[in-house]
């Protein structure tokens, strides 16, 4: 199988790395060469760490050699499976999938790593809804076991079978869910993070205390505000907006503080500052 990944960022790079580690030939696309170079550097560093710990079957250079980096979408023409991992914006994704639907070979499967946008809507844009599915990986991809597999309204049984088997070949545990905003993971997780942010806004406690209470009292490995910073506050806001709009319930209304921090460019780890400084 030839594996394609759109987006060389944190998620796309991780998906590409895991696919290459699993023996797949991988094509990775991004809009600019500098984005590809940055993504390649992150993959190299990650592979180096795994090699030092004895957790890599092949040499790092062998794994990296399986990945082709490109700025040309035409390079996906002969891919069997293409996973999109770009910005969480439905219109941008729709435009991309419309192009991919015309480029990728007719039997090729298109998948989205979206964390909240309805799969059925993206599938319609692709022009091949039977061969479209959600593959929601968790961050960081090389370490996290779960892949949420989300069928759209017209996703075929064969597409679901192939994608489930592929996720297993990547060393992941695929779990199926239906096409609702936020699926399972973010429908449960994001309101918790949003409520932690609301606690900061209302002065219930300082960020360190909120995180400490959830770690020590609820046995969470990472506090909710640290996790929000790690995910990216802009991503958290985008997901909350999809939940709020898609489900029509004000319990999913984004915290005003979350919106204000995103407007201020305080996006968390990726920008150097969020609820903590990095």
From Swiss-Prot:
It is an enzyme of class 1 (oxidoreductase). This is Probable 3-hydroxybutyryl-CoA dehydrogenase. It catalyses: (3S)-3-hydroxybutanoyl-CoA + NADP(+) = acetoacetyl-CoA + NADPH + H(+). The keyword Chloroplast does not apply. GO terms for molecular function: 3-hydroxybutyryl-CoA dehydrogenase activity; NAD+ binding. One of its GO terms (biological process) is butyrate metabolic process. Belongs to the 3-hydroxyacyl-CoA dehydrogenase family. Its EC number is 1.1.1.157. Keywords: Fatty acid metabolism, Lipid metabolism, NADP, Oxidoreductase.
